[in-house]
């Protein structure tokens, strides 16, 4: 009896890898070529660092005579999303980008804030990405006393401020609003608004608004007024899109967790392999949250106790990080469990074998290139749907608080890593895998389509027009990633997903004129190639020193007398001379070339087969050789006349029990032994301590060794 097996199920075809590489490079080039056309806000250039923005904003207030000593400071980078969406839908993405670059609309801005806890009075300054002054706000209590000047005098103060501070030219601005209000403290506040006669974009208006508090400027704003009809339509669309998004997201989260928990309950896998990825996701998430701590001050309400505000924030961070770790852990263990039923003797996350680090980097390279294909697809999708169908989506790079964090690249890391790992485990592995299991391996196209649809429409929360545009776009991506997963492995789809998220987030950093942001952008790019390093190291080591060739095929065959010397050299506590002479015993050897790297043995007692030992050398563990040895000897014992095959496992051999359970062996006979009729507390504790101190069985003592799959 001789059985031959390959040492790794994944054998990449060179021409396929070359083709993927060429498509990936072409994809990146297409993405860059169509970036300006397809992606809104591609013309934004953030030229200020955090420190520079703080200095300029503080100088603006100091020039107005305000003293900021004793105030807490917060800085954020934000946008007027309503105005941006209206202009993009009205003008089209390409025209919007061109006019945004030349007319410098007040869409994106730095927001600098000075406040004191539990005090209403505070200051805000708004700056353009280039540092130009966009406005300010001095928030005062309503009962603060102040001057009571006429509206005419107040307008003169307002116009003087606009002319000196904001380059306002009265001949191109038309006043559209003027109102006055007496505050409880007796102060009279006057508000004025002007619209530009040179601005044309649908029914939108470019405005200056200013409020005079008593005889001082209390508020100055430069903004685009969006028509109320658009605001109402937009809110209605967002309600429908949000409902679809929430339903799809709920199905994904609950469905994937239920599948994972059921698979874990049926399989009881070893969970240690999921710890490191879960810690990685939690670590990156924690780093991103800590990196965002300076932003939290921007959302502080001065009616809340400052210490309580920070306690609540820290608790929120702890729960968010813990949840991401637990979710990743459960999904990963569930994926390993489900693979027992759908892909036996395969690791669909990453191929196992002697070349596992080379396979890891090969999958990472493949995912990197396929991420380039995704980038090109999205750019082309919105370019052509906008021109042919009138569709629109701000599928834009992340111009947001990423610029206001100390280490901007952590924002991209978190957006890339957490989403890619959790979503690919939930959708591609557990969703697709469960449907394959449910359909008995049939209807593969349906098993790929259904998760892709749910995943796509779980992104309808993104702003698009029509609201299903994002769903259509990502359904194609979901089908693509599902096919890639079935063709290769989950790591390929994770890296592809990771690459796309990282690039669309990090490209804003690379396009900035500020050196620090560009360096952060290159850190993001460098992170994309990190998964290639293990394979490069392996290749360098092989090139620098002679290593024995990788064994491509392993053989399972019956014991021969010439094997006795090698068997005696294995770290197994038994007498092979005696065992090999037992007429009712079967011994099978796992051979890698001339070397015996594993063995399994069992015997026949009447019509009952017993497996009483199995061993695989450490180098070959976690590659399913233990499973193959177990299957082959069971078949061999039944061929010899066994009507049933059993394995004896002691109560403390938990890993052996888990290993057998994973191979769908179940408990058939319970053997109970009585220790004492009654034990005192002291005797019970003594027995417990002795059990804890008891040495674990070795690799061979009437038990299955651990860690063999």
Model-predicted regions and their roles:
Residues 237-411, 415, 423-426, 436:
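Core alpha-helical transmembrane segments of integral membrane proteins
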Residues 379, 392-548:
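Transmembrane helix-loop-helix hairpins at the membrane interface
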Residues 199-238:
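Extended, hydrophilic extramembrane loops/domains of integral membrane proteins
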Residues 627, 651-669:
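Conserved active-site alpha-helix within GNAT-family acetyltransferase domains
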Residues 616, 622-635, 662:
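Conserved acetyl-CoA-binding loop-helix of GNAT-fold acetyltransferases
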Residues 568-612, 630:
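Acetyl-CoA-dependent GNAT
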Residues 7-14, 31-36, 63-129, 174-214:
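Exposed beta-strand-loop-beta-strand "reactive/processing" segments of non-cytosolic proteins
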Residues 637-649:
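Conserved GNAT acetyl-CoA-binding A-motif
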């Amino acid at each position: 009896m001789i059985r031959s097996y390959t040492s790794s199920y994944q054998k990449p075809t060179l021409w396929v890898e070359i083709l993927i590489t060429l498509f990936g490079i072409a994809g990146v080039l297409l993405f860059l070529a169509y970036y300006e056309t397809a992606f809104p806000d591609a013309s934004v250039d953030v030229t200020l660092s955090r420190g520079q923005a703080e200095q300029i904003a503080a100088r603006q207030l100091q020039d107005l005579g305000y003293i900021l000593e004793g105030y807490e400071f917060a800085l954020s980078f934000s946008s007027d999303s309503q105005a941006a969406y209206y202009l993009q839908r009205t003008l089209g993405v390409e025209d919007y980008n061109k006019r945004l670059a030349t007319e410098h609309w007040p869409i994106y801005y730095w927001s600098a804030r000075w406040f004191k806890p539990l005090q209403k009075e505070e200051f805000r300054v708004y700056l353009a990405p280039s540092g130009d002054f966009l406005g300010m706000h001095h928030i005062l209590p309503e009962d603060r006393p102040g001057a009571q000047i006429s509206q005419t005098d107040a307008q003169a103060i307002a116009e003087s401020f606009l002319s000196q501070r904001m380059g306002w030219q009265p001949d191109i601005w038309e006043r559209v609003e003027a109102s006055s209000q007496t505050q409880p403290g007796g102060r009279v506040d006057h508000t004025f608004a002007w619209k530009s006669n040179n601005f044309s974009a649908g029914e939108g208006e470019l405005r200056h608004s200013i409020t005079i508090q008593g005889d001082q400027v209390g508020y100055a704003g430069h903004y685009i007024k969006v028509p109320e009809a658009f605001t109402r339509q937009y809110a209605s669309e967002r309600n429908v899109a949000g409902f679809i998004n929430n339903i799809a997201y709920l199905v994904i989260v609950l469905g994937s967790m239920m599948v994972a928990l059921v698979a874990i309950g049926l399989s009881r896998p070893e969970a240690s392999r999921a710890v490191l990825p879960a810690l990685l996701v939690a670590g990156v998430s924690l780093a991103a949250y800590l990196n965002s701590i300076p932003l939290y001050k921007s959302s502080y309400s001065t009616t809340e106790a400052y210490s309580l505000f920070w306690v609540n924030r820290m608790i929120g961070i702890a729960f968010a990080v813990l949840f991401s770790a637990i979710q990743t852990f459960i999904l990963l263990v569930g994926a390993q469990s489900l693979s027992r039923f759908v892909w036996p003797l395969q690791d669909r996350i990453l191929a196992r074998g002697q070349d596992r680090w080379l396979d890891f980097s090969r999958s990472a390279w493949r995912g990197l290139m396929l991420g380039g294909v995704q980038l090109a697809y999205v750019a082309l999708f919105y370019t052509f749907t906008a021109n042919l169908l009138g569709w629109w989506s701000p599928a834009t790079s992340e111009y947001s608080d990423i610029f206001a964090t100390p280490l901007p690249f952590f924002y991209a890391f978190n957006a890339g890593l957490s989403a890619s790992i959790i979503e690919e485990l939930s959708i591609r592995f557990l969703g697709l895998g469960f449907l394959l299991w449910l359909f008995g391996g049939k209807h593969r196209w349906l098993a790929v389509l259904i998760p892709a649809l749910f995943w796509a429409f779980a992104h309808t929360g993104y702003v698009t027009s029509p609201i299903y545009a994002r769903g259509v776009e990502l359904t194609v991506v979901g089908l693509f990633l599902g096919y890639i997963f079935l063709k290769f492995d989950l790591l390929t789809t994770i890296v592809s997903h990771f690459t796309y998220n990282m690039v669309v987030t990090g490209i804003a950093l690379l396009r900035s004129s500020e050196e620090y942001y560009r360096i952060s952008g290159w850190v993001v790019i460098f992170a994309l190639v990190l998964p290639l390093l293990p394979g490069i190291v392996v290749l360098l080591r092989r090139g620098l020193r002679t290593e024995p060739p990788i064994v491509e095929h392993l053989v399972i065959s019956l014991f021969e007398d010439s094997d006795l010397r090698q068997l005696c050299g294995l770290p197994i506590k038994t007498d092979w001379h005696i065992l090999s002479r037992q007429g009712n015993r079967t011994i099978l050897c796992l051979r890698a070339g001339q070397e015996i790297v594993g063995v399994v043995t069992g015997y026949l007692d009447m019509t009952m087969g017993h497996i009483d030992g199995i061993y695989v050398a450490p180098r070959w563990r976690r590659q399913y050789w233990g499973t193959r040895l177990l299957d082959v000897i069971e078949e061999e014992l039944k061929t010899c006349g066994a009507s049933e095959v059993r394995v004896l496992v002691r109560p403390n051999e938990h890993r052996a029990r888990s290993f057998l359970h994973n191979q769908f062996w179940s408990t058939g006979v319970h053997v109970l032994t009585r220790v004492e009729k009654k034990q005192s507390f002291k005797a019970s504790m003594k027995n417990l301590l002795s059990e804890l101190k008891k040495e674990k069985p070795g690799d061979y003592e009437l038990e299955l060794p651990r860690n063999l799959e």
